[in-house]
Swiss-Prot record:
<feature type="compositionally biased region" description="Basic and acidic residues">
    <location>
        <begin position="12"/>
        <end position="28"/>
    </location>
</feature>
<dbReference type="GO" id="GO:0008270">
    <property type="term" value="F:zinc ion binding"/>
</dbReference>
<feature type="coiled-coil region">
    <location>
        <begin position="246"/>
        <end position="270"/>
    </location>
</feature>
<dbReference type="InterPro" id="IPR000571">
    <property type="entry name" value="Znf_CCCH"/>
</dbReference>
<keyword id="KW-0479">Metal-binding</keyword>
<protein>
    <recommendedName>
        <fullName>Zinc finger CCCH domain-containing protein 15 homolog</fullName>
    </recommendedName>
</protein>
<dbReference type="InterPro" id="IPR032378">
    <property type="entry name" value="ZC3H15/TMA46_C"/>
</dbReference>
<feature type="region of interest" description="Disordered">
    <location>
        <begin position="352"/>
        <end position="380"/>
    </location>
</feature>
<feature type="compositionally biased region" description="Low complexity">
    <location>
        <begin position="38"/>
        <end position="50"/>
    </location>
</feature>
<dbReference type="GO" id="GO:0002181">
    <property type="term" value="P:cytoplasmic translation"/>
</dbReference>
<comment type="similarity">
    <text>Belongs to the ZC3H15/TMA46 family.</text>
</comment>
<keyword id="KW-0597">Phosphoprotein</keyword>
<feature type="zinc finger region" description="C3H1-type 2">
    <location>
        <begin position="165"/>
        <end position="202"/>
    </location>
</feature>
<dbReference type="GO" id="GO:0005829">
    <property type="term" value="C:cytosol"/>
</dbReference>
<dbReference type="Pfam" id="PF16543">
    <property type="entry name" value="DFRP_C"/>
</dbReference>
<dbReference type="Pfam" id="PF00642">
    <property type="entry name" value="zf-CCCH"/>
</dbReference>
<keyword id="KW-0175">Coiled coil</keyword>
């Protein structure tokens, strides 16, 4: 018998109507609300109902899980086909100077937390050759000898070849190379590989270039320098005062003017002789004003004239040029009289106050008790002076009305 057909499910229109009914029930009375919160709630309900109650972020989570699954598979394949042995570093070696083996194959998952270096150029960086170790001092045990080396040693001993003596003296070529920073893995001694002198510095040896750095010049402060120069002048010197300074300033200004005048005369004489080196264009026109007239006008030339503009606003303000030399010559010493307090000012004030008090006491003793008693010649006080003042004022008003 053929299998039973599955019962027909609800149509899409029916499902859509159900969803619209659910949305209408949940948002009843909120469609006409214009508040931001109400509108967001309506949109959220519509999205939930349309998506069938599933959270929209589930698709993103699925994609993330699939991506992680693929990465895990790639790691497993890399471990299968590209096995890497665990790196071991000798004691005292910086791990950052060793390139990570997993990083070379692109399988390192530690990133910046990896203790090994992820810089591929680190392999090209070789440790500098030590200047305190002679590479020829390394022991060469017999276990590392080959047949050729063994034969060479036997022949040397049988022939009785004399070995060149060795010494603790440092090779001068080695010292020169170290001082000039030329010593390295590619440096070779001019004496060859059989040089009897040492190619290493003893412990505690200081190079000349390092000595120069250590010998810093003694620094002296500005105050100490001024005091030193003043002491070197000697005791018999002219003291600088305002008058001597102004005289010196005046003499310097005169010397400067004389020097400028002599220089101008020299340039003028050179210009008259045809020498124009070191002469500016302004000086040329000042020495020979005829140079302004450059000949008759030609076709295409523009005519112009120079004149001074007269403006009331410009003439209303008068400007004066300040001459520092004239101001310095007109300077005078400050008169400190009346502005500087004396050292005995407090004692003087106390003495003056004591004198004033003594004078007042003496005057009081001379006057006697009559000075404190009231004077008998004083006019008597009339207590009823203003008693009838109100009546008098009323009489005055009546008189004024009668007059009117």
């Amino acid at each position: 018998m053929p299998p039973k057909k599955a019962p027909p499910g609800p149509s899409k229109k029916t499902e859509q109507k159900k969803k619209e009914k659910v949305i209408e029930d949940k948002t009843f009375g909120l469609k006409n609300k214009k508040g931001n919160k109400q509108q967001k709630f309506i949109q959220q309900v519509q999205k939930q109902v349309q998506s069938g109650g599933q959270h929209p972020r589930q698709d993103g989570d699925k994609r993330k899980e699939e991506k992680e699954k693929k990465l895990a598979e790639q790691r497993e394949m890399a471990l299968i086909f590209k096995p890497v042995q665990t790196q071991k570093v000798e004691k005292g070696t910086d791990p950052k100077s060793v390139v990570c083996a997993f990083f070379k194959q692109g399988t390192c998952t530690k990133g910046d937390k990896c203790k090994f270096s992820h810089d591929l150029s680190q392999e090209n960086k070789v440790e500098k050759r030590s200047i305190y170790v002679d590479m020829r001092d390394e022991d060469d045990p017999m276990t590392n000898w080959d047949d050729a080396k063994l034969k060479e040693v036997v022949e040397k001993k049988s022939s009785g070849e004399k070995q060149r003596p060795t010494t603790d003296i440092i090779c001068k070529f080695f010292l020169e190379a170290v001082e000039k920073s030329k010593y390295g893995w590619f440096w070779e001694c001019p004496n060859g590989g059989k040089c009897i002198y040492r190619h290493a510095l003893p412990a505690g040896y200081v190079l000349k270039r390092d000595k120069k750095k250590e010998e810093k010049p003694t620094e002296i402060s500005l105050v100490d320098l001024i005091e030193k120069e003043r002491a070197a002048l000697g005791p018999n010197q002219t003291r600088v005062t305002l008058e001597s300074f102004l005289a010196w300033k005046k003499r310097k200004i005169a010397e400067k003017k004389a020097k400028l005048a002599a220089e101008e005369e020299r340039k003028k004489s050179d210009f008259s002789k045809g020498k124009q080196f070191g002469i500016s264009g302004r000086e040329m026109f000042s020495f020979n004003p005829d140079l302004v007239d450059d000949g008759p006008m030609e076709e295409g030339d523009a005519a112009f004239d120079v004149y001074n503009r007269e403006d009331d606003d410009d003439n209303a303000v008068e400007f004066k040029e300040l001459d520092l030399a004239a101001l310095s010559l007109a300077a005078k010493e400050v008169d400190g009289s009346g502005t500087i307090a004396s050292t005995n000012r407090l004692l003087d004030q106390a003495t003056e106050a004591a004198k004033t008090a003594a004078a007042e006491d003496a005057a009081a003793d001379e006057d006697g008790p009559s000075s404190s008693a009231p004077a008998n010649d004083a006019a008597p006080i009339n207590k009823d002076l203003f008693v009838d003042l109100a009546g008098e004022l009323d009489d005055l008003d009546l008189d004024d009305e009668d007059d009117d």
